[in-house]
């Protein structure tokens, strides 16, 4: 429930669901310093309890989640229908055969282009804010130096191409069409 997520708290928060009762007991201890009883640690745990303030905020925000998700889908529809630039690769909508079982909630709208940095500058010059989420591939993170020798060409290609367009329940359709217009006016080598 990171604040920037579709259902976000005021600060970091999270939840785990399971139907495994044994796992429930372990997880409850792990979130409470590894303990079921005060000062009786049976695991190396952490303080990961959801405090009352975060729970209250999430409870209120949950009431608006469906409407906000519908708004995100409206914006995505504008993007999918409007962006026609052949230099941009758009995300695919949920496949028809999967729609019976799944719906996309569109946390992010991530496009790809071989000219990402140029596009980002062009969009910025046109008043469109973008983000590069997760700018360093996992296998190149310091914590994973044991993987640094791996050859992951698809990961690295995608890493160099991804760009997140604005998407959120407060974005107006007019603003979404402005994003579309800016994307469509991008020309390779124009910057």
Segment roles from a protein language model:
Residues 7-11, 102-105:
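Short glycine-enriched loop/turn motifs at secondary-structure junctions
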Residues 1-9, 37-42:
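Conserved active-site segment immediately N-terminal to the catalytic lysine
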Residues 19-191:
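PLP-dependent aminotransferase class I/II
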Residues 3-9, 15-17, 164:
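Active-site phosphate-binding strand-loop segment of PLP-dependent enzymes
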